[in-house]
């Protein structure tokens, strides 16, 4: 959030998890993987832990390290005579969709996945981004499905496809979260872990009440593009490193119209509860800002384009 004073916050954003299981793939590449989990540790479909809807790693130390690295890269580009005018300004992102299931739960129809892609395209099209469903694969693995957050490394090492420019989406039960994502700067160190994980029931018309319009994926992909939560840093100076998102002291839940947690002349504007990077209901969020768009372009240019 860019206003005037937004502290480097502490919430966690790391990798996005959801369970997307495609039953049928029409006209697209599709493969099937069958893995057997040694034990079936079934977790209840809890979607939050306290007030943590998103499991992406946004601890202050993580954010500070990422911003330091970003500053170095920007300095390097400046030395080469490159400016923001030469950043990528949108494009087509190929999507590799990995549907996980325990053999009974997590099954997604092709139409479910197609609906999710439409939601993403509607959200990002105003900013020049489009998502192309490159392939769908299905994996039967009890352990991975029931807790893809804890089993992330094994799952992703087996299923990840593409390059830094390509988006891997995993649908499953991501521990206690609705979803989580990696940030662009982590690709260089751990390319195989790059991607977004979402709760399988958060897709459009899924069973996750108030979070079943597909915007868990929209939110987590925002992280994949390099965005932070709108409430990152609270009412302090740097906030979410975006100039046109009003400062917000803490995450907003449900749809609290008129909420204003950072008050005074230094903090114009109400809390951005309608922003995709807050924690409100899917029905409440519907936009990114021009500043967020500029950051997405910059981060894609620095960390994903041509990688």
Q: What residue spans do the PLM features occupy?
A:
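Solvent-exposed, acidic/flexible segments
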Residues: 106-113, 210-215, 270, 289, ...
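Short glycine/proline-enriched loop/turn "hinge" motifs that connect secondary-structure elements
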Residues: 85-90, 188-190, 267-270
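Metalloprotease/metallohydrolase-associated module, dominated by Zn2+-dependent proteases
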Residues: 244-307
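Positively charged n-region of N-terminal signal peptides that target proteins for export
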Residues: 1-5
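Hydrophobic alpha-helical membrane-insertion segments, chiefly the h-region
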Residues: 11-22
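Second-shell loop/turn segments in exported
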Residues: 100-109, 206-211, 283-284
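Propeptide-to-catalytic entry region of secreted or membrane-anchored zinc metalloproteases
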Residues: 25-167, 171-175, 301-306
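Metzincin-family zinc-dependent endopeptidase catalytic domain
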Residues: 114-254, 258-259
């Amino acid at each position: 959030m860019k206003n005037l004073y937004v502290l480097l916050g502490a919430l966690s954003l790391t990798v996005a998890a959801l369970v997307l299981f495609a039953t049928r793939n029409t006209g697209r590449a599709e493969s099937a993987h069958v893995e057997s989990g040694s034990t079936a540790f079934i977790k209840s479909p809890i979607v939050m832990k306290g007030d943590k809807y998103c499991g992406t790693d946004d601890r202050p130390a993580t954010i500070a390290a990422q911003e330091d690295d970003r500053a170095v890269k920007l300095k390097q580009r400046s030395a080469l005579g490159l400016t923001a005018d030469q950043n990528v300004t949108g494009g087509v992102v190929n999507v590799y969709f990995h549907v996980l299931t325990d053999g009974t739960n997590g099954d997604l129809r092709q139409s479910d996945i197609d609906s999710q892609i439409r939601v993403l395209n509607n959200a990002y099209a105003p900013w020049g981004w489009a998502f192309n469903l490159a392939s769908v694969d299905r994996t039967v693995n009890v352990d991975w499905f029931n807790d893809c957050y804890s089993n992330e490394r094994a799952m992703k090492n087996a299923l990840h496809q593409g390059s830094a420019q390509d988006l891997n989406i995993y649908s499953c039960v991501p521990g206690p979260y609705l979803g989580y994502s990696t940030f662009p700067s982590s690709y260089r160190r751990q390319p195989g872990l790059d991607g977004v994980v979402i709760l399988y029931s958060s897709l459009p018309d899924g069973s996750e009440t108030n979070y079943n319009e597909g915007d868990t994926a929209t939110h987590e992909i925002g992280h994949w593009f390099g965005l932070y939560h709108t409430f990152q840093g609270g009412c302090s100076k740097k906030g979410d490193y975006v100039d046109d998102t009003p400062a917000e002291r803490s995450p907003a839940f449900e749809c609290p119209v008129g909420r204003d947690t950072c008050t005074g002349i230094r903090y114009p504007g109400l809390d951005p509860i309608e922003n995709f990077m807050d924690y409100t209901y899917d029905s409440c969020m519907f936009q990114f800002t021009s500043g967020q768009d500029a950051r997405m372009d910059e981060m894609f240019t620095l960390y994903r384009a041509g990688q």
